[in-house]
């Protein structure tokens, strides 16, 4: 900001373009720190020149892109942020399309940069920026922590985290999940019990909060987590949550991060407000993104899942899941039991519908919807998903394949998925040794 107000002239544009080309050429991550006044007005007529917009759009699925807003950023500089994979800003920063002077001349509105695009707008309301930090040092530290989950580029293998807490573990999740499906519970403690050191990197925690998107290292390997948070809107999915999850999954798929989906929701948000916001369009986008993913997909149903809410959380049969798990106490169906049964006059029939949903996990397992349903109340209850992770290797361009063994699978058989380096998936059924 000390040089021509931080505006982007032809020389600055050339530098930005050059850095983008270097990141592509050397196949390394690109980190941008924003504090600028946008494009320099008196150089608008300088003719056609290479730009960083196109380069950033191409890079976003090739190398990790991180954008840090460390001050006021407007116009051209601010518009580069949404092209990145991850965006963070400091508490005093702002990110706006146009600054206060232009807003005043165009609309008569007298506002400040912070009111236009401070953290409360850019993060909480708009969802443009993912995370907020205290200052520049914290922003750089967060960028390092984020990049630690990613390879240098989309062709490299994922980094492995070694440490005393990176081994296999037995975890009983049942005390963390209330048996009453109407009682909300926090979802993050569930993941903290599964991952190394209990360390989660929440991405965009304050926007679209019905869905949690986070990065972690279970068994020393990087994963992406997309989970329903029952403590927010009872786990009902709204448009902001869907958009957040879709972007997060797109980034995970680009860099071969296996993805864990955790469902526990009554479906997508209903009502006139949700319909006016295009909830079905948002939900369809998330379904399409998760369906197109080439990375290993692992699904867990904790308590309940209904309707389209199950489809957007990767619980679709024959949709490329590596492992699909559930607690035996779950309920599932096209609709929750009460609404589904409300249209039935016969009380015996209503009771039958409710009973069917309460036994849903056992019936679903028998039909191979789930690969395993853990047994409640015994020493065998620990969810073996965490033990599976050390064997999960993404089958992307730079990796040799994937092999996951599913102990105690349905029907007294052992299911072993062998996924070669190609996209072909070869399921092999093996009799369990007795």
Q: For each predicted feature, which ranges?
A:
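Short, intrinsically disordered C-terminal tails of secreted or membrane-associated proteins
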Residues: 429-433
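Ligand-binding clefts of soluble mixed alpha/beta catalytic domains
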Residues: 1-426
């Amino acid at each position: 900001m000390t040089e021509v107000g931080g505006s982007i002239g032809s020389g600055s544009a050339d530098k930005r373009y050059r850095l983008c080309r270097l990141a592509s050429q050397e196949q390394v991550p690109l980190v941008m720190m924003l504090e600028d006044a946008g494009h320099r007005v008196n150089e608008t007529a300088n003719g056609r020149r290479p730009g960083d917009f196109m380069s950033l759009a191409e890079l976003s699925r090739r190398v990790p892109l991180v954008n840090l807003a460390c001050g006021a950023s407007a116009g051209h500089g601010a518009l580069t942020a949404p092209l990145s994979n991850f965006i963070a800003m400091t508490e005093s920063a702002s990110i706006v399309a146009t600054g206060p002077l232009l807003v005043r001349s165009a609309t008569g509105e007298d506002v400040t940069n912070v009111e236009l695009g401070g953290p409360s707008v850019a993060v909480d309301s708009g969802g443009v920026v993912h995370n907020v930090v205290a200052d520049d040092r914290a922003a750089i530290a967060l960028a390092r922590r984020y990049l630690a989950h990613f390879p240098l580029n989309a062709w490299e293998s994922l980094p492995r985290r070694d440490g005393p807490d990176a081994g296999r573990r037995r975890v009983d999740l049942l005390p963390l999940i209330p048996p009453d499906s109407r009682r909300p519970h926090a979802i993050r403690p569930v993941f903290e019990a599964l991952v190394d050191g209990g360390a989660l990197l929440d991405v965009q925690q304050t926007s679209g909060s019905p869905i949690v998107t986070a990065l972690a290292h279970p068994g020393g390997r990087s994963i992406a987590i997309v989970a329903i948070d029952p403590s927010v809107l009872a786990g009902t999915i709204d448009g902001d949550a869907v958009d957040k999850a879709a972007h997060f999954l797109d980034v995970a798929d680009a860099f071969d991060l296996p993805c864990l989906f955790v469902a526990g929701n009554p479906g997508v948000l209903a009502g006139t407000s949700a319909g006016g916001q295009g909830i079905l369009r948002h939900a369809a986008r998330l379904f399409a993104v998760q369906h197109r993913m080439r990375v290993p997909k692992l699904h867990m149903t904790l308590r309940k899942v209904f309707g389209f809410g199950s489809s957007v959380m990767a619980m679709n049969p024959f949709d490329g899941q590596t492992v699909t798990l559930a607690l035996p106490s779950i309920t599932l169906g096209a609709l929750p039991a009460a609404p589904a049964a409300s249209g039935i006059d016969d009380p015996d029939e209503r009771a039958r519908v409710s009973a069917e949903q309460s036994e849903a996990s056992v019936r679903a397992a028998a039909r191979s919807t789930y690969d395993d349903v853990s047994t409640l109340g015994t020493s065998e209850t620990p969810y073996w998903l965490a033990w599976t992770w050390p064997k999960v290797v993404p089958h992307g361009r730079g990796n040799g394949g994937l092999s996951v063994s599913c102990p105690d699978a349905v029907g007294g058989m052992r299911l072993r998925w062998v996924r070669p380096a190609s996209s072909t998936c070869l399921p092999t059924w093996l009799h369990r040794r007795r």
